[in-house]
């Protein structure tokens, strides 16, 4: 049985990971990534386009499935001695989708005035329903949600 996760990062950082086929969370920490397993569904939420800016992007910016082959997170090279922990991801072809139209339908936000609370953790588990709803909003292939079920 697969799990589903939302990771949080600026869109600029997400795009780099999407282009290179990996994910990293919480400034490269290993512990959160140990909860994520091959076959799990991943969605990235980006509050901003660029880290530190307040442009109000608030959108889902990538969706995919953790690749099989490496059972544990590994360290990647970013330069300057920074070696963050990562997991490889098969990113789906999808469009960015704003979160606001989904707030009343997502299990983790529905009926909550402080809907951004969970997003502060950087990585948290979501329901199958939420993953499918986000995938649909992003125009991701239907096989993505089916492949992780």
From Swiss-Prot:
InterPro entries: EVE_domain (IPR002740), PUA-like_sf (IPR015947), UPF0310 (IPR022996). SUPFAM superfamilies: PUA domain-like (SSF88697). Coiled coil: none annotated. CDD domains: EVE-like. Belongs to the UPF0310 family. This is UPF0310 protein msl3206.
């Amino acid at each position: 049985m697969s799990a589903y996760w939302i990771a949080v990062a600026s869109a600029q950082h997400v795009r780099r990971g999407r282009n290179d086929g990996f994910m990293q969370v919480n400034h490269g920490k290993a512990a959160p990534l140990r909860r994520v397993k091959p076959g799990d569904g991943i969605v990235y939420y980006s509050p901003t386009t660029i880290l530190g800016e307040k442009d109000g992007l608030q959108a889902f910016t990538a969706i995919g499935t953790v690749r099989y082959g490496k059972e544990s997170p590994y360290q990647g090279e970013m330069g300057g001695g920074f070696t963050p922990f990562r997991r490889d991801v098969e990113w789906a072809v999808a469009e960015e989708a704003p979160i606001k139209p989904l707030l009343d339908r997502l299990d983790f936000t529905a009926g909550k005035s402080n809907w951004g609370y969970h997003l502060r953790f950087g990585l948290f588990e979501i329901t199958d329903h939420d993953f499918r709803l986000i995938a649909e909003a992003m125009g991701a292939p239907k096989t993505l949600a089916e492949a992780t079920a």
